[in-house]
Design a protein with these regions (language model features):
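A generic structural signal for short, well-ordered alpha-helical segments in conserved domains
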Residues: 23-27, 124
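Short acidic loop-to-helix transition motifs that present clustered carboxylates
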Residues: 45-54
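FMN-binding flavodoxin-like domain, especially the glycine-rich phosphate-binding loop
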Residues: 2-7, 12, 17-18, 32-33, ...
Length: 169
């Protein structure tokens, strides 16, 4: 399998901008790491709502979906992810909608609330129900402990891993 056939979708659900900023940082770090490799693989970044009608096209062993999503209100999806979530969670969807698609979810939340990282947990569960392949275990980032250090640890681990997957011949 050529790396030129591989696609990384970095998608986010963000209420206050933290998840979007993390997603864009992740995108930039991946792009910087593969620069000069000669690879023409595709790496993009969009809010989850922009993927509502196209996520069924992710169904491919050549696709990797990296989700960064915060939880808002009483365990709810952020405004730029709520339409996606309504569609994505429908039980009428075929179980193999995302067959062989790799995924990793980073959920942002605050452990002072009962539904800590609820959206990240729900998205992670739903990807699994739709026959996706975990690329990495769920990462729950606790805003009560400060985001920066936790996010840095995640990025230091996942970026090289994504690059190895992208550039694997």
């Amino acid at each position: 399998m050529s790396s030129d056939n591989r696609v990384v979708h970095v998608v986010y659900g963000s209420q206050t901008g933290n998840s979007e900023e993390i997603a864009r940082t992740l995108l930039q770090k991946i792009q910087d790491a593969i620069a000069g490799s000669g690879s023409t693989c595709i790496v993009d970044c969009k809010p989850l709502n922009e993927w509502t009608t196209t996520y069924t096209q992710w169904n491919s062993e050549r696709a990797l979906v990296l989700v960064v999503c915060s939880t808002t209100g009483n365990g709810d999806a952020p405004v730029n992810a709520c339409h996606f979530w309504r569609q994505f969670k429908k039980r009428s969807q075929p179980k193999d909608t995302l067959d062989n698609t790799r995924f990793a979810v980073m959920g942002l939340g605050d452990s002072n609330y009962d539904k800590f990282c609820n959206m990240g947990k729900q998205l992670n569960r739903r990807f699994g129900e739709m026959s996706s392949v975990p690329f990495r275990e769920l990462c729950c980032v606790d805003e009560a402990l400060g985001l920066e250090e936790q996010v840095d640890v995640y990025l230091e681990e996942i970026v090289p891993r994504v690059c190895r997957w992208l550039l694997r011949a």
